Amino acid sequence: MGNCCGSKPLTASDIVSDQKQETILGKPLEDIKKHYSFGDELGKGNFGTTYLCKENSTGKSYACKSIPKRTLSSEEEKEAVKTEIQIMDHVSGQPNIVQIKGSYEDNNSIHIVMELCGGGELFDKIDALVKSHSYYSEKDAAGIFRSIVNAVKICHSLDVVHRDLKPENFLFSSKDENAMLKAIDFGCSVYIKEGKTFERVVGSKYYIAPEVLEGSYGKEIDIWSAGVILYILLSGVPPFQTGIESIIVSTLCIVDAEIKECRLDFESQPWPLISFKAKHLIGKMLTKKPKERISAADVLEHPWMKSEAPDKPIDNVVLSRMKQFRAMNKLKKLALKVIAEGLSEEEIKGLKTMFENMDMDKSGSITYEELKMGLNRHGSKLSETEVKQLMEAADVDGNGTIDYIEFISATMHRHRLERDEHLYKAFQYFDKDGSGHITKEEVEIAMKEHGMGDEANAKDLISEFDKNNDGKIDYEEFCTMMRNGILQPQGKLVGIHI
């Protein structure tokens, strides 16, 4: 608007920046702020930040994912961003998939403008369902899951494999009761090629298919990940609980016997009360052999999905577990960091030296590039994606670097959690007033200090681990959470060892 008449002449620097500078997206550089005004930060990852933005010409709100170009240090990373945008364009316009508005590149960043999905995550919706009609049923779960599988079906029909399906990558379009659930993140997605399999380890812990760990896979991995989501929707916990303790800065080569053998627990609560047809569908989706796995189209035709899911309430323990599963990562990461701060030089042995060797510029923190080079020196053959996942796992405060304490907390041996003196020090950190109990306010303060949570998370954590219902967590309850929580490691590691 108003750019055709009366605009000021181009300067020499404009001409250089717009015409001569090599671009990543292959189109002229453009100032996105000519078209959009930026507002609050909506979310942040290690390699990009999503902002609320408003289109100047219409006043309509969108989400904008901005990726600093300095984080795209390799051709592989640049191609990945281009592929993400191409795939979003390719699948845009379909139900249950976020709509892309446009992409821009300036001197500093690449910007992806997309539909704003302001209705919250899956678990938020389930909370709302419980509050609106006092219970959550298999029928509710089937309605939610239908949208997830439909997104997978669309991707596969358009020759796209998502590769990173998880609850966090789905958002509701609005707060309306009938809002549509949409897949929002295609950063790991690739095109399917006839007869070609993929080798690179991608995806997120809990949702990764066994063939990904074995190094040869196809689109069937999306069915596995969706099956894990359904298991969580019906029980509140994932079927294969490989947590943050299994991903340390020494390796990302996880070999988890439980995943590879596909052992499913249908005996513990609430499974005896869940319908046979629901368990039958999960079994079809979490079949070890990819070629025997049910397709997305057939999932949608399964009897449980076609209005046969019971409408009776699921045990309240399921909702309780979901809240725990969502909030536990943050508190346990923070507690591990507190324990790491209290370890002696003797206890951490060679970890300090390893950190110093990786911290090439002696800044006191390890950048992505330093982590990548350090792992290479130790003989690691990790891909760019795998190094990124390590970075995300170890970077507790989400500032894009790993400081010394974060490094120690990610690499220290987990038997430290068995020692009472370490657990007590961590407990004392949260117990600010020395009362012998941790309150919601104390959890909230600790998590806010590290930029790791909000009041809702703190309240959920207190309620889930407060076994005697006094509104506080005592020391015994804290130890139980740390030692026996859902993030207890169950796999083993191969690769580099410290």
From Swiss-Prot:
Active site: D164
Binding annotation for Ca(2+) 1: D359, D361, S363, S365, E370
Membrane topology (UniProt): Lipid-anchor
Domain EF-hand: 346-381, 382-417, 418-453, 454-488
Subcellular location: Membrane
Gene3D superfamilies in alphabetical order: EF-hand, Phosphorylase Kinase, domain 1, Transferase(Phosphotransferase) domain 1
Keywords: ATP-binding, Calcium, Kinase, Lipoprotein, Membrane, Metal-binding, Myristate, Nucleotide-binding, Phosphoprotein, Repeat, Serine/threonine-protein kinase, Transferase
One GO cellular component term: membrane
Annotated positions binding Ca(2+) 4: D466, N468, D470, K472, E477
Catalysed reaction equations from the record: L-seryl-[protein] + ATP = O-phospho-L-seryl-[protein] + ADP + H(+); L-threonyl-[protein] + ATP = O-phospho-L-threonyl-[protein] + ADP + H(+)
Reported function: May play a role in signal transduction pathways that involve calcium as a second messenger.
Protein family (similarity comment): Belongs to the protein kinase superfamily. Ser/Thr protein kinase family. CDPK subfamily.
Protein name per its UniProtKB record: Calcium-dependent protein kinase 22
